[in-house]
Amino acid sequence: MTVLGVGVDIVDIERFTRALERTPALRQRLFGPVDTQPQDLAAQDLAGQSLAARFAAKEAMLKALGGNISGFSWHDIQVTGERGQQPKLVLSGGVARRAALSGVTSTHLSMSHDGGMAIAFVVVDGEPRS
């Protein structure tokens, strides 16, 4: 197995939370049902940092695949996992097609938040396609 790509993204939690408050439809556009299931989203003080980290994970996934993916929806990348569990990426649609065409067989995700920032790091591996 070979590392095919690495992506990282960082999000300012307060700025991201303000954007969600200003534009209520943004939350539905960026996040699907899997993204919004975790218990930590029920606590208002944790929801902003959790959603910011999930958005960073989506951006990091796109970067790990090389970016420039046309015909994708933000719902094509969803993050699963409850507090204390290893988060996982669920791919579908255009992003899943791009991953398959690139030879991706597994993804690895790490997310964190501190000091008002949320960060996500994604590694994709598999067998390169020619």
Predicted segments, located by residue:
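Core catalytic alpha/beta fold that binds nucleotide/phospho-ligands
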Residues: 1-130
